[in-house]
Amino acid sequence: DSILTAPMKSVCLNGTFVEPAKLADPLSMLERNHLFQRIHTFGGTAPFLSVHLEILTRALDRLYGMQTDLSESRIADRIARLLEINRFPRQSACVTLRLFPEGIDEGSDRCEYLIETDRPLLYPHFVLWHKRMMLDTVRCDAPHEGYPTAAALLCDRYAERTVRRRGGELAARESRDGVLLGVGGEPLLIVSG
């Protein structure tokens, strides 16, 4: 996703900062099985990092029967440093933490992680806002629905492309039973009244 499109000076691979151009083919990386979390940062820090790491840890255990030793303080430090290196605004940004249970390269025998800056966010704090959009739904179930997997990411991309071809702006993915699953890879938040 963003490895392919976002201009970055550096990414963090297993705690080491490297230039994206020095990575193996980014497209093949995204095609490998991986779990991910998009993390909103404020003031250069990730305020709910422990929750994101817990989600990844649980998913890794349930889907792969593996444990991880991701240190919250080390990941927090790497996120802050990565935002600084890539000159992201201090107010609000989004980073993606990807966990590759089978490693990034063929033949790897260990779980690896990648942190990348995703995009600056246009609001300074948690804000509810609205925009009138043309929304359309696409039926597409991902294996292990509800977990942040590469398959779910590909299903979201498929839904977005399908809706754009139909002339819409935003894709809501739904299950074969008609249950809304999310919009653009993000959970749904509905406010009524």
PLM regions and their residue ranges:
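Helix-start/capping segments and mature chain N-termini
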Residues: 1-81, 102-193
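Phosphate/pyrophosphate-binding loops at sites that engage ATP/ADP/AMP, CoA/4′-phosphopantetheine
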Residues: 82-88
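Ordered, amphipathic secondary-structure segments that act as subunit-interaction surfaces
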Residues: 88-99
